[in-house]
């Protein structure tokens, strides 16, 4: 049985590095690029090396050693043009 926990994140864009860094509490400049370079980041089962990959609603993002989440899309935009995005983390 799979349990999903819904989490809202405040991000600047729908880029993979922005959302994954918020969900897994990783550094966008240090830890996440290293995971991308070493081939430990997957979207829908395919290895991704591009930090700028734009996520689409329904994408399943998996990071080895951190976990997996389903990206559900933008909930709303803030006054400062940032986005609240909805994700569901596998527990």
Give the label of every model feature segment:
Residues 31-32, 41:
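Short hydrophobic/aromatic patches on the structural cores and recognition surfaces of FHA
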Residues 19, 34-35:
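Generic alpha-helical secondary-structure signal
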């Amino acid at each position: 049985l799979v349990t999903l926990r819904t989490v809202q994140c405040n991000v600047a864009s729908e880029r993979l590095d922005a959302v994954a860094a918020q969900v897994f509490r990783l550094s966008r400049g240090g830890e996440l690029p290293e995971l991308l370079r070493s081939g430990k980041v997957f979207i829908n089962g395919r290895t991704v090396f591009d930090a700028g990959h734009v996520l689409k609603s329904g994408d399943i993002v998996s990071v080895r050693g951190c976990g997996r989440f389903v990206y559900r899309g933008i909930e709303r935009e803030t006054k400062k043009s940032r986005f609240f995005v909805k994700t569901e983390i596998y527990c």
